[in-house]
Amino acid sequence: VNRSVKWCSHLSIGKAIADLAALSTGERKAFLDGIVEPDRHHERIGRGVSSRRLSHHRASERLIMLHVWMARRSFLRNDDYEGYRHLGMALHYLQDRSVSKGFLGFTHDAREARLAKQRVPMAAIEDGMRRYMATPDFVRRSISRTRPLKDPSKIMFQASFSSAAVAAAVLDARGAKEAGREHRRLRKRHALILFPLALGSLAVGVSLSLVWMSPFPLLISVPFTIFAVHLDMPYRRSARLAEWNGISRH
């Protein structure tokens, strides 16, 4: 499949998102440049002679989230060019996750050629830009739920919806004030109650086990520690959300 066909679907989805988000000329160029960047200049991992080219059709959730975080942090620094470029790269990898490689990859190029003939379903773009949450956890779930498909129309629909939802989540900066209030509340609970409870129960268990030369006190303390850690999960989520909104976690 020639390069223009491989880029066609990415650019079509990108242009639809750029139109709906009303990006300026400069923002649009950076975004669309980013969305074809992985095909234009293949990313590599490792260093020197041990480096290898990254297969973007097998891009990991971690790699996509790396570009998502780089985009978000760039926007928080008012570096819109880098923000839109990294967002475009993240969406490229996300869209490629929708395309099944087939047996030994032999059908992949043919599937991409058929996909290039598909029109972008604007209903999926609009739906994605409505049905989102501006949180890193939402973005991660969207990535993990994107599955390789074989039917071109289903591929285009899934790629369009997930790309629009992730783009909207990354671009939405309206929740910073509320996220800051919630994080401060949970941070106080974490510092005064849950962290001391988890650490204290574990310390008591270890101390009694050493004094009694028995593992049972430690075994008894472990469930209390796990319970305290479980109760503290909202704090950890709020800490990620605070970072997402450029708020100090401490």
Describe these PLM feature segments:
Residues V211-I220:
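Short, aromatic-rich membrane-interface segments at the entry and exit
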Residues V1-N78, R85, F103-A176, F195-A203, ...:
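N-terminal, motif-rich segments that launch catalysis or mediate targeting to/interaction with membranes
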Residues E178-P196:
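Juxtamembrane/start-of-transmembrane alpha-helix segments at the extracytoplasmic/lumenal side
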